Amino acid sequence: MAYQAPQHALLARHAFVRMAMMMLVLLVGMRTQRVFAQQDVAFLHYWRMETQWNPAAVGQSPQLSIQGAVQTHAMGYEQAGSTMWAGADMAFAMGNTQHGVGAMFLNDNIGLFSHKRFSLQYAYHQPWKGATLAFGVQADMLQESIDGSKADLGNKSDPAFPSALVNGSAFDLTIGSYYQRKALRLSASYHHLAAPTVRLGETHELPIRGVLNVGTQYNIRTSSPLFTIIPSAMLRSDFTDYRIDVTLRGQYSFENRLIFGGINYAPQRSVALFVGGTLQGIDISYGYEAYTSGLGLGAGQHEIVLAYRLPLDLGRKQRNLHKSVRWL
């Protein structure tokens, strides 16, 4: 069935449609703090979850790394939704070359919109002039849905919005890289390289914009060998909007134990505090992000991240615990 021109034109501007629907859900006139396409969630713990946004980060440790995160949206508002992410990765060697593989799943719900993504990841790690250079690729399967039956619209026959649940899927690609030299780390990735258009039912479609992610961090040693100060920053942009996060955290590590805390600031968006550490072999971190505009400080979002590393024996004896170069 051919697409109707008015519907196609309106949904081609899906960012504006999504914003309007969210404003209906989160009270008319109140500004939402979600940014970019719904498919790209801005996690507060970007520095701890690099495999979530950069496939080159998989396989940095000989251990099996398992991570999970839950993020709530706009506390106190009905149908504000939440995001769940889970991922696992590991390293392996082929001759004298180092590689990494991983898999992850993302489930994001907000208002009438639902996004799911399943991804397989591969990375190649190469020593280079006293540093480590890595390149990664990620195959994504996207599933999008809009439940128009939940929309409270004045005009029920508005062709811009579906009247029932519609869904669709598409294949996508992500590429990434990182450069690590001693205390300095630079990372970059590009999401939605395939620029897919997801068909929702017979009369609607959802184009997906590409998103560029750039991150950096530097470990500052102090007079105490156990305490480290770590400034980091990240830029996310879909070339029509952007978000910058600037983070400062302090970290205390002793043997296999870790305690950290810090502050994050996203100009014109939010301020956040987080704290975490190692509990019974599991790394756990909690953060609260409060909006400095729009919804206000009280309607922020909570975020919890868990991580566990399981030693593997892939033909080599790994008797010593390995400290990952991941953004800890």
Task: Name the predicted role of every residue range.
Residues 1-15:
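N-terminal secretory signal peptides that target proteins for export/translocation
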Residues 1-2, 25, 186:
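Generic secretory/membrane-interface signal
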Residues 6-9, 33, 325:
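Residue-level detector of intrinsically disordered/flexible regions characterized by low predicted structural confidence
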Residues 18-31:
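Bacterial N-terminal signal peptides
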Residues 31-37:
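Sec/Tat signal peptide C-region and signal peptidase I cleavage site
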Residues 38-328:
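Subset of outer-membrane beta-barrel
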